[in-house]
Amino acid sequence: SAYVDCERAIKAYTDAGVAASKLVLGIPFYGRISFDKSPGAIDYNKIILLDKNDYKIDNWDSNANVPYVTYKGSYYCGYDNEKSIAIKGDWIRSLGMKGMMYWDYNADDNQHTLCKAVWQAVMK
């Protein structure tokens, strides 16, 4: 899972002597499409507009603590939303990390839902 990868990277840095308070967690504002013939990504602002007749968004992966999309019942992509960002905010604070950053701003929706969620997650 992404948490295992993040934990491993953070541990490598802290084991090398970098203080956790100097590290930030980077999160994408897109979902990674990995099963398709041509893997790619889909921005959050496109995920929330997917046709609800074919796509189900906001399924929840309780192991990774992230939502994911299914297409006609099959896995399509995982991504972050307000809930998963809040969980990641709690996690980085528990590790004593500096904060969180994202890529990229233009992938957020017009209400800046994810940007606001990052702000809340880091500043609370």
Tell me the role of every PLM-derived stretch.
Residues 3-10, 82-89, 97, 112-115, ...:
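Extracytoplasmic/secreted envelope proteins and their assembly/folding machinery
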Residues 102:
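Short beta-strand and adjacent tight-turn residues that come in two discontinuous sequence segments
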Residues 1-22:
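Catalytic-core region of carbohydrate-active enzymes that cleave or remodel glycosidic bonds
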Residues 1-4, 76, 109:
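Chitinase-like catalytic core of GlcNAc-active glycosidases
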Residues 22-91, 117-124:
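Glycan-binding loop/region signatures in secreted carbohydrate-active enzymes
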Residues 18-24, 95-99:
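Loop/turn elements at helix/coil->beta-strand transitions in domains of secreted/extracellular proteins
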Residues 105-111:
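Acidic-and-aromatic substrate-binding clefts and catalytic sites of carbohydrate-active enzymes
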Residues 32, 111-112:
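Short Asp/Glu-rich motifs
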